Amino acid sequence: MGLLDKIHNFRQAKELMDIDLYNYFRVIESAQENTVRYQGKEIIMLGSNNYLGLTNDPRVKEAAQNAIAKYGTGCAGSRFLNGTLDIHIELEEKLAALVGKKKALVFSTGFMVNQGVLSSLAGRKDVIIIDRTDHASIIDGARLSFADVRKYRHNDMENLELVLESEKDTNKLIIVDGVFSMEGDIAKLPEITQLAEKYGAVLMVDDAHGVGVLGKNGRGTSNHFGLTDKVDLIMGTFSKSLASVGGFVAGDADVIHYIQHLARALMFSASMPPASVASVSAAIDVMLEEDWRHEALWRNNDLMRARLDDAGFDTGPSETPIIPAVVGEDMVAFKMCRRLSDEGVFVNPVVSPAVEQGNALIRLSLMATHTEDEINQAMDIMVKVGRELDIIPG
């Protein structure tokens, strides 16, 4: 079979298109807010990572516009060469203070952070240890490092210790999601930090979904547990609570200096553009000044979770405003997603191999700016469609 033959044989997406159940690359015609314009009508958005509701905030947009006026639309180079602006440095200082580390380094995307950090820190004689449900960027970054990759069962501390014990004579890096992006549960950081210390492993937390959601004023998972000093590296993204695009890693000054000079994803990629840098900086300011957003996010989480539980939905181990509704087979998830959008709710289907076969789910995520009426309206629709598809009892 020729290299391109597999392209002609790739039918999965087209088969879904043929039966009008393709739920990817959907075109939204408005800003990402609690409601969006989709296929010509306003529907409730329960599929966005805009946790604090800041992507369309006037102050964040004004900061981006001012940055374009001063610096232009791009940096025309990598951070390593001509692409570092004074606002990059200012943002890095703000991020380091936010997560309680000495120094931070900004990348153009969150995915690139994990690629760059893992491939620069670990090598062929090292071991990277990951949770089975860690984000794809962690898996790809670990592969790029050429280190041996060991997986442990999801949030299973006994299994993690078995892996660590079997690798006690090697250099080890544990990397774990602070908040797991599909399940919505939180890493068992108290136990993980103890095991990392016991077995001499470096510990990195991917806090893409933790910053803005957990900790004092949204400072993240490590802050939430009071374990910032026990975590060597904290990674985060700007495409969720911080209303933009990009990512960062924060840690000891010498470690960040090392990554600066060896992370190919940083050195050979164009710098994060001025508008994005300024919008993140403004979003951090708003997040720290307006704690009501954090409180509202968790109040909305409690309401939605109660409605789902009362209706009989299986929400798995979720502990955060990422709430999965387990529906079973992949095709059921596709059907439910389509029916919900028809009825006025935008959600995301998560199917195998992202989850195990038979455990497909509808991934629901909340914003601080959702109103009680919007949540109740969306939940009424969820219950209606769930009963139609025999996911919950009638």
Regions found by a protein language model. Give the residues of each.
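PLP-dependent enzyme catalytic core of the Aspartate aminotransferase-like
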Residues: P58, E62-N66, K70, A97, ...
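Active-site phosphate-binding strand-loop segment of PLP-dependent enzymes
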Residues: R150-V205
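N-terminal "arm"/small-domain region of PLP-dependent enzymes with the aminotransferase-like
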Residues: H8-T73, A201
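Conserved PLP-anchoring active-site segment centered on the Schiff-base-forming lysine
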Residues: V117-A136
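Conserved core segment of the aminotransferase class I/II
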Residues: L233-M235, L242-D291
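Conserved active-site segment immediately N-terminal to the catalytic lysine
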Residues: G200, D207, G220-F238, H257-H261
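Conserved N-terminal alpha-helix of the aminotransferase class I/II PLP-enzyme fold
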Residues: E62, N66-T109
